[in-house]
């Protein structure tokens, strides 16, 4: 099934590429940093990085904003609220909460691929409050219950 994702560039991002899939099998399309020149993020610091795009999703869809694995592995750069969710009724610019978990300052340049966006269908269930839940073999055993 194919859907339409409408993308509008902000006035200051007309020179940046539209989000793009970098391979035939890529689940996420890359997003680009819409910074003026460069932004340096020191270890432990957080910066809000604009992408220069606004999107319109069909109803019952969301965009998940995720870190790029190469930036995380090589520089310690990731997103604080990952995955970030863009709801179908949001029309503002997508901005990224970027943190440097590495040991060295990292410079983000204008037009650099900084995150990826994955589009997913959303199911909104009917919510029913109950007194009991069905039993399972696992029940409430959580964190590490199958071993580490």
Swiss-Prot record:
One of its GO terms (molecular function) is dUTP diphosphatase activity. Its cofactor is Mg(2+). CDD domains: trimeric_dUTPase. The keyword Hydrolase applies. The keyword RNA-binding does not apply. Belongs to the dUTPase family. This enzyme is involved in nucleotide metabolism: it produces dUMP, the immediate precursor of thymidine nucleotides and it decreases the intracellular concentration of dUTP so that uracil cannot be incorporated into DNA. This is Deoxyuridine 5'-triphosphate nucleotidohydrolase. It comes from Caldanaerobacter subterraneus subsp. tengcongensis (strain DSM 15242 / JCM 11007 / NBRC 100824 / MB4). The lineage of its organism: Bacteria, Bacillati, Bacillota, Clostridia, Thermoanaerobacterales. The gene is dut.
């Amino acid at each position: 099934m194919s859907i339409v994702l409408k993308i509008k560039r902000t006035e200051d991002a007309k020179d940046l590429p539209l989000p793009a899939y970098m391979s035939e099998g890529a689940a996420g399309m890359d997003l680009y940093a819409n910074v003026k020149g460069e932004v340096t993020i020191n270890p432990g610091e957080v910066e809000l990085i604009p992408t220069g795009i606004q999107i319109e999703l069909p109803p019952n869809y969301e965009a998940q904003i995720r870190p790029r694995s190469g930036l995380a592995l090589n520089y310690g750069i990731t997103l604080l609220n990952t995955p970030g969710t863009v709801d179908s009724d949001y029309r503002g610019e997508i901005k990224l909460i970027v943190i440097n978990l590495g040991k060295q300052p990292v410079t983000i340049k204008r037009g650099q691929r900084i995150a990826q966006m994955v589009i997913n269908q959303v199911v909104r269930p009917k919510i029913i409050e109950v007194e009991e839940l069905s039993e399972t073999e696992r029940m409430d055993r959580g964190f590490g219950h199958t071993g580490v």
